[in-house]
UniProtKB/Swiss-Prot annotation:
Homodimer. Induction: Expression is induced in fumarate- and TMAO-grown cells. Spectroscopic studies suggest that CymA requires a non-heme cofactor for quinol oxidation. The gene is cymA. Heme c 1 binds at residues 46, 49, 97. The keyword Translocase applies. The lineage of its organism: Bacteria, Pseudomonadati, Pseudomonadota, Gammaproteobacteria, Alteromonadales. This is Tetraheme c-type cytochrome CymA. Belongs to the NapC/NirT/NrfH family. Residues 1-12 are cytoplasmic. Binds 4 heme c groups per subunit. Contains one high-spin and three low-spin hemes.
């Protein structure tokens, strides 16, 4: 490829025309990416592959399925990062799950989930521990300071004492609360 040609002014097109075309392509690409990310982050999309097992019912039966506050979490609230760059990276990483859905016999079955639940749960716990349970703290922002009045005194003490520890020795949400949305397997 002739790299010098990329930096030469075009004899055929004006710089303004090239700039406008570049901007239009950039804007269309940006909005197409945003729409794709949004469309693939709905519960309906998640359930298109995870439909034949108990995951959705587990969440609905948990405190995250419409507890006292009346809030029902969506799959992406826990399973996808909330920052734009991390979000895009995670979407790229989990695209391999589509390959698994298409190639692993029985992937979308309760039997597969039961057989692989421990491994999948451990991967999820490692993800949460690796980011200090950022997804939990995205919604539970008041857990360390200005706790809600509905929080039990013992829970206030435990969270306050944990927050006082050095970050390296501090527990993260899933160390005490694993299995709050999906049951954590025994053993």
């Amino acid at each position: 490829m002739n790299w010098r040609a990329l930096f030469k002014p075009s004899a055929k097109y004006s710089i303004l025309a090239l700039l406008v075309v570049g901007i239009v392509i950039g804007v269309v690409g940006y909005f197409a990416t945003q729409q794709t990310l949004h469309a693939t982050s709905t519960d309906a999309f998640c359930m298109s592959c995870h439909s034949n097992h108990s995951l959705k019912n587990e969440v609905l039966a948990s405190a995250h399925g419409g507890g006292k506050a009346g809030v029902t979490v969506q799959c992406q609230d826990c399973h996808l990062p909330h920052g734009p760059v991390d979000y895009l990276i995670k979407k790229i990483i989990v695209s391999k799950d589509l390959y698994g859905f298409l190639t692993i016999d029985g992937f979308n079955t309760q039997a597969w989930l039961d057989e692989n639940r421990k491994e999948q749960a451990d991967k999820a716990l490692a993800y949460f521990r690796g980011n200090d349970s950022a997804n939990c703290q995205h919604c539970h922002t008041r857990i360390y300071e200005n706790q809600p009045e509905t929080m039990k005194p013992m829970a206030v003490r435990m969270h306050t004492n944990n927050f006082k520890k050095d970050p390296e020795t501090r527990k993260t949400c899933v160390d005490c609360h694993k299995g709050v949305a999906h049951p954590y397997p025994k053993g």
